[in-house]
């Protein structure tokens, strides 16, 4: 067994998560926020409805009236852009976003986004410079001009060919004690959802780290079986990949490759070439610079 396989081999395909929520999140029900509008502790909820032309988001939040929010729709493994909408929060905290549905098939990610730095001064001042006063489970970091800023985000992942309604997902964070350590660990759980494998993983990687998912087929190349995402605030992440229909045995590979485009704090923790990485998941990259990367491998033998 290769050394970098050690952490991942104990995790196999289990159950069908459609029967219940993942341990990494809970489905957010529509409800009236507990905190008043304009509170630094932001609450947001809602649902997504899909028809042949439109992806519609109907939601509620305690963001102040007039706050601008955006809806972005992305299709996995596609470079399509421009599928967005923008609206303002109403006096009662409600909002509606309508995004044109792309005319291609595939799993889609819908994100609702609020950035204090994009608001008028009155609203921006409520949440501090770069959103540093924001609180709650919907707060994420992003980097701009080498500075870490804060935003509010909630979303949903769905296949429009299989789903017509889905809730926005409320995250539940559980940051490990060794979060951000260069001795990286990844604990994945693979669940089969119809024609997809959904990979949920816990790790101690820093928020914003780019992780990739591919499928390694023995003895041959196969395209179109990949996904990528950014690590969440507690080191967790999830990705989805189509289940191969012809292969009997293959390996799901999760990788993290440090590079010059990482956030500043990640460069300090891991090194731009991964030179500070350690632990059983470290693998030498195939380059002349001697770079290091993280790789977790999960052998899969599909169920009938």
Predicted regions and their residues:
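Serine/threonine-biased, Pro/acidic-interspersed low-complexity stretches characteristic
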Residues: 1-78, 85-220, 227-304
């Amino acid at each position: 067994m290769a050394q970098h396989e050690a952490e991942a081999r104990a995790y196999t395909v289990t159950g069908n998560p459609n029967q219940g929520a993942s341990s990494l999140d809970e489905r957010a029900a529509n409800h009236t926020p507990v905190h008043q509008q304009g509170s630094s502790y932001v609450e947001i909820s809602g649902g997504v409805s899909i028809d042949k032309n439109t992806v519609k988001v109907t939601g509620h939040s305690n963001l102040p009236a007039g706050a601008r929010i955006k809806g972005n729709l992305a299709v996995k493994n596609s470079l399509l852009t421009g599928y967005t909408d923008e609206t303002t929060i109403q006096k009662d905290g409600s909002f509606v976003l309508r995004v044109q549905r792309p005319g291609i098939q595939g799993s889609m990610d819908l994100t609702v986004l609020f950035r204090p730095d994009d608001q008028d001064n009155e609203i921006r001042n409520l949440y501090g410079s770069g959103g540093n006063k924001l609180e709650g489970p919907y707060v994420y970091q992003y980097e701009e001009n080498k500075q870490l800023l804060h935003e509010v985000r909630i979303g949903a992942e769905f296949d429009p060919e299989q789903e017509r309604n889905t809730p926005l997902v409320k995250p539940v964070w559980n940051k490990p004690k060794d979060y951000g350590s260069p001795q990286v660990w990844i604990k994945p759980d693979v669940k089969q959802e119809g024609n997809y494998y959904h990979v949920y993983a816990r790790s101690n990687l820093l928020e914003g780290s780019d992780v990739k998912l591919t499928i390694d087929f023995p003895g041959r190349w196969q395209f179109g079986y990949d996904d990528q995402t950014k690590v969440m605030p507690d080191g967790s992440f999830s990705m989805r990949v189509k289940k191969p229909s012809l292969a009997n045995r293959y390996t799901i590979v999760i990788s993290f490759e440090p590079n010059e485009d990482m956030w500043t704090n990640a460069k300090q923790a891991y090194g731009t070439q991964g030179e500070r990485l350690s632990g059983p998941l470290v693998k030498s990259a195939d380059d002349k610079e001697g770079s290091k990367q993280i790789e977790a491998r999960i052998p899969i033998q599909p169920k009938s």
